[in-house]
C-alpha cells in the first residue's frame, strides 16, 4: 500500500520577548496538535502499529531559519515517525521594551503538520 494524507493541521506560536525561534516553534507545534483528534487512525484505517503504518511531516516557518532546531518538533512528537523541514517565513514584528529591556523582538512561527497513513 501507499502512504496517503489523512490530515493537514496548522499551528501558530509566538515568543513575545527575545525572539527565540525554538520557543515559538514549540508553541506552534503544540497549537497544531491541540486542534485535532485523529480518531480515524484507529477507527477507520484500523492502524495497529503507528510506527510503521503512519508518518508525519512538519514544515516549520520562522523568520530566522538558521536559528531554528527542527528537533524541537521531532522530540515533541516522538510517538510518531516524523521528519521536519525549516523554511523562511513566520514574522518578527517589533515588540515593546519594558524597563529598558533591549530585547523587543517578537517571533511568530507557523508549523504545518501533515499526517500520512499507509492505506
Where are these regions (language model features)?
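Conserved mixed alpha/beta catalytic, RNA-binding, or beta-rich assembly cores of soluble enzyme
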Residues: 2-48, 65-69, 73, 107-119
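Generic structural hydrophobic/aromatic packing signal, biased to beta-strands
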Residues: 8-10, 56-60, 84, 113
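Short glycine-rich, basic-tinged beta-strand/loop micro-motifs
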Residues: 49-63
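A generic structural signal for short, solvent-exposed coil/turn residues
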Residues: 50, 76-78, 105
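A glycine-rich helix N-cap at a beta->alpha junction
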Residues: 68-88
Amino acid at each position: 500500500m501507499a502512504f496517503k494524507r489523512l490530515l493537514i493541521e496548522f499551528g501558530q506560536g509566538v515568543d513575545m520577548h527575545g525572539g527565540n525561534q525554538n520557543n515559538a516553534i514549540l508553541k506552534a507545534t503544540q497549537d497544531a496538535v491541540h486542534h485535532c483528534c485523529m480518531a480515524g487512525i484507529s477507527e477507520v484505517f484500523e492502524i495497529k502499529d503507528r510506527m510503521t503504518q503512519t508518518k508525519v511531516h512538519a514544515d516549520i516557518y520562522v523568520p530566522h531559519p538558521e536559528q531554528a532546531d527542527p528537533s524541537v518538533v521531532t522530540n515533541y512528537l516522538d510517538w510518531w515517525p516524523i521528519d521536519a523541514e525549516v523554511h523562511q517565513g513566520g514574522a518578527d514584528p517589533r515588540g515593546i521594551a519594558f524597563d529598558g529591556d533591549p530585547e523587543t523582538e517578537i517571533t511568530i512561527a507557523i508549523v504545518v503538520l501533515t499526517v500520512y497513513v499507509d492505506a
